[in-house]
Amino acid sequence: MRCSPGGVWLALAASLLHVSLQGEFQRKLYKELVKNYNPLERPVANDSQPLTVYFSLSLLQIMDVDEKNQVLTTNIWLQMSWTDHYLQWNVSEYPGVKTVRFPDGQIWKPDILLYNSADERFDATFHTNVLVNSSGHCQYLPPGIFKSSCYIDVRWFPFDVQHCKLKFGSWSYGGWSLDLQMQEADISGYIPNGEWDLVGIPGKRSERFYECCKEPYPDVTFTVTMRRRTLYYGLNLLIPCVLISALALLVFLLPADSGEKISLGITVLLSLTVFMLLVAEIMPATSDSVPLIAQYFASTMIIVGLSVVVTVIVLQYHHHDPDGGKMPKWTRVILLNWCAWFLRMKRPGEDKVRPACQHKQRRCSLASVEMSAVAPPPASNGNLLYIGFRGLDGVHCVPTPDSGVVCGRMACSPTHDEHLLHGGQPPEGDPDLAKILEEVRYIANRFRCQDESEAVCSEWKFAACVVDRLCLMAFSVFTIICTIGILMSAPNFVEAVSKDFA
């Protein structure tokens, strides 16, 4: 089917005429609507009746939560609608004109503001056009970046759930002039945040009475409920702190002779202090509550500090001066008997006699036998030499009851010959033999004192090992209890771990 050129031109002219007529109707309608319109006048048919305004919002994004300054920054589109009695027209008289738009300031609109605004301008909305249809229904959708004051409860940080309120209401109209009604918030266009999960945004309408006026002042409060995502803080704060606190237990496994026990404890304590400062930088300077992670750091620092104190005691035991005195009886009973039995620890050389003692006995016996074989028939000089070496043979090892180590203290069982040796006088014609016997006595006493000192040192060293093992077990239990008890006390700990670490 072919269309003639005349028909095409006729259709084009008709469309242009329709457009020009529609533009003329819009111009005429604008003139009629604003002819006697006063933007200061509340647009109601009866001034005694309140104007109903429906209010809602659309949350697009949680931009920032400043815990230190306690400010919530959100991207929100406000939604306000009402009926303007003076902005109505008959569609048949203005064909094609179903809606008109009025810029800010030309028509009346409610002065609804965010009560708890923290913005420098207070009103952070961008004033857009008001959309009006033929029935007088007005729709106002101003977007804005809202900064609102929000009380940040850091009690369960980093497993916390925050509830930030957005309170909206008319700044100058009371309830008898403007009836503010709430509609549900829209989160269909919400953009997820990397730090916070949006739980919900319930709303509530309330009325408040002031002493100045009898009329109520309605307001609409939306509560932005959000849960902190703990993956970041878990990987950068919690897990390193747990590992550092576990390193503190290695202080009790490090040998006392290494000289690094105190250094390791102090290093761990300084590391925890650094993490504590990192947490303090992002937390508000408030004394209302102590963050959960700060409680964990504080308890861990106390445990590490106590471990350093115990390490000092262990080193004092390990390097105890043998001339400083014996171990007290109650210390020996508690540490060397009860605690050692509980920890299944055995003293060094408990199951067998020290080889050094056996060697000394064998050496003394051999010397006695040899000298007895070489000695001449009983005479004054020979008898003295014979008696002297038998006296040395009488010095044998006997463990004493108060010794911490078996065969650690040398106890002498003097024989009759030794009494003769000590009490007898050397003959006048043998000064060399007298000197030899004096030197032998000196050497024997020196060995006896050395064994006593070694016994005392071994006793204190074993006590230090017992304290190390006991503190290792005790501090391990305390660390596990603090880690599980403090961190799992958060109400949403299981939910946070299952969602963020899964």
Curated annotation (Swiss-Prot):
Residues 260-267 are annotated as: Essential for TMEM35A/NACHO-mediated proper subunit assembly and trafficking to cell membrane. PANTHER family: NEUROTRANSMITTER GATED ION CHANNEL. GO terms for molecular function: acetylcholine binding; acetylcholine receptor activity; acetylcholine-gated monoatomic cation-selective channel activity; amyloid-beta binding; calcium channel activity; chloride channel regulator activity; monoatomic ion channel activity; protein homodimerization activity. Activated by a myriad of ligands such as acetylcholine, cytisine, nicotine, choline and epibatidine. Oligomeric amyloid-beta protein 42 activates specifially CHRNA7:CHRNB2 nAchRs. Activity is modulated by positive allosteric modulators (PAMs), such as flavonoids, with a wide range of chemical diversity, pharmacological sensitivity and efficacy. AChR activity is inhibited by the antagonists alpha-conotoxons RgIA, ImI and ImII, small disulfide-constrained peptides from cone snails. Alpha-conotoxin PnIC selectively inhibits CHRNA7:CHRNB2 over CHRNA7 homopentamer. NCBIfam families: LIC (TIGR00860). One of its GO terms (biological process) is monoatomic ion transmembrane transport. Component of neuronal acetylcholine receptors (nAChRs) that function as pentameric, ligand-gated cation channels with high calcium permeability among other activities. nAChRs are excitatory neurotrasnmitter receptors formed by a collection of nAChR subunits known to mediate synaptic transmission in the nervous system and the neuromuscular junction. Each nAchR subunit confers differential attributes to channel properties, including activation, deactivation and desensitization kinetics, pH sensitivity, cation permeability, and binding to allosteric modulators. The lineage of its organism: Eukaryota, Metazoa, Chordata, Craniata, Vertebrata. Pfam families: Neur_chan_LBD, Neur_chan_memb. Keywords: Cell membrane, Disulfide bond, Glycoprotein, Ion channel, Ion transport, Ligand-gated ion channel, Membrane, Postsynaptic cell membrane, Receptor, Signal, Synapse, Transmembrane, Transmembrane helix, Transport. This is Neuronal acetylcholine receptor subunit alpha-7. Residues 316-466 are cytoplasmic. Glycosylations at Asn-46, Asn-90 and Asn-133 are essential for TMEM35A/NACHO-mediated proper subunit assembly and trafficking to the cell membrane. Its main location: membrane. The chain crosses the membrane at residues 234-254, 259-279, 292-315, 467-489. It is found in: Postsynaptic cell membrane; Cell membrane. Disulfide bonds join C150-C164, C212-C213.
